[in-house]
């Protein structure tokens, strides 16, 4: 019996006790949670092979996409919805690795900017290429139509969850 069979058995037991119990909804929620966890674990393991975590990767890609590859800590924080404290911690790690450097802002001498170094540019380009192949391996298991449907359903659910929680 595989993991999902066990999960279904447990949820079906609840359904048998209460015929009104939302079996399908509970199963879908559990499948989403487990799929998300497994994907996060796989991505963490992949990025760990390059010596970074997902948060550091997101900071690097955000800087790479920025004009002149340079942003303030608050701009990064806002774009990624990370706390300023977390951005400081990640920046310390990336600076120690040689991927970013802190610079004085030209607009405000009191402010700092975080800029990708040439080593950071090379690293993120190499990592992005490897990640592209990895993502194709993961998502290539689904057909193009299944991928599109998955995207539509997830966007719809995310929008609904935003409405429900506000």
Regions found by a protein language model. Name each.
Residues 1-20, 145-166:
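C-terminal regulatory/oligomerization modules of transcriptional regulators
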Residues 1-50:
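N-terminal leader segment of winged-helix/HTH proteins
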Residues 23, 37, 41-82:
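N-terminal helix-turn-helix DNA-binding core of bacterial DNA-binding proteins
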Residues 27, 58, 148:
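Active-site phosphate/pyrophosphate-handling residues
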Residues 29, 33, 37, 81, ...:
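Short amphipathic alpha-helical segments with heptad-repeat character
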Residues 73, 91-92:
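Short, hydrophobic-biased segments on the C-terminal half of alpha helices
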Residues 92-149:
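Charged, amphipathic alpha-helical coiled-coil/dimerization segments
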